[in-house]
Structure formats: structure tokens, C-alpha cells
Amino acid sequence: FCNAIHLVEDKSQVMREVSDTLRSGGIFAFNSSFFKGDLTEETSQFYRRWMMRSLRILKNDFGLKPSKEKVMARQALSIAEYTEILEDNDFRVSMTEIEPVEVPLEGWQDISYFEDFIAGALPGVPLKEASRSLVEAAAQIFNEFDLSSVRRDWLSIVAVRQ
């Protein structure tokens, strides 16, 4: 699961199915940039400003606002919660790692075109308008605060089937 496990609604079921498929000693690995603990204080500040600016652009330019629904990508799990689900499904965690990555403006703008990200960040907003507001807001925030990049932490977990 390359940066997708957070999109799965029933993580326990998926891990159970993977466990049923693997033999003892088999490896299940995944990563995610959306987990409890993924945002540093700097990243949180950027993200709040980015989302608030996006909302303002959506309202002012398109007369739109997102729905209040909470989608799967916004229901983040902690390392401990992932570990518990894995252990409940006959896995032993052999490695967890958090890797800090400096993401330039282009990276934030690129993700602004990704449908699953938009559904999490601005649920219910049409893709075209959501993308335009996210891209423009990111550029404005980077410019305003003279940013060259913003850190994002990536979680990687490797587990062994018992």
C-alpha cells in the first residue's frame, strides 16, 4: 500500500485479508503521509493557512463551500493504532519509520489535482474549482511567507505475518 492505507475504510478487514493470504514470515509493508502525528507545528500552520485561503478563494471566486462530511483520508490513525490492528491480525511490526520530506510548492500544487486529496480536503466541491482554489492558495501562502518548502512526515510500517 503506497500512501493509500489511510484511504481504506476498514483497515482491519484489509489486514485480515492480507494476513490470510501470506504465509508465516510473509511481509506486509505500507506507508502513509496521512496519520496522527504527521504534521509538525510549521506544517500545521501552513496547512491551516492553505485551507483557509482555499476556502476564501472557493467562496469569493466560485460561490462554493465544502460539505461538513468527514471522509476516510481525514480519519487518521496513530502508529499505536496501526500496530494494534496489525497485531490483532497476526502480524508483528518489525519496523516503523517516520521520514521527514521537504515538499516544494510544486508538490503541494501537484497533490491539489489528486481527486482523493480533494475529496478529503474540500469534500463535496467540484474537482475543477477545488483544484484551482488549492493551487492558487498554495502559491499565495508560499509567496506571502517566502517559503521554499514545507515539511511533511511520511510513516512507513513493515510487519511480519506470524
Residues of each region from the PLM?
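Conserved class I S-adenosyl-L-methionine
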Residues: I27-K59
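Short alpha-helix
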Residues: A73-D90
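Core SAM-dependent methyltransferase catalytic element
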Residues: D90-F91, S112-F114, R151-Q162
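Short glycine/proline- and acidic residue-enriched helix-loop micro-motifs
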Residues: G63-E69
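A short glycine-rich, Lys/Arg-flanked "PGG" loop and its adjoining helix->strand segment in the class I
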Residues: S12-I27
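A short SAM/SAH-binding and catalytic strip from SAM-dependent methyltransferases
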Residues: F1-S12, F34
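C-terminal helical/coil "lid" or tail adjacent to the Rossmann-like core of SAM-dependent
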Residues: V93-S148
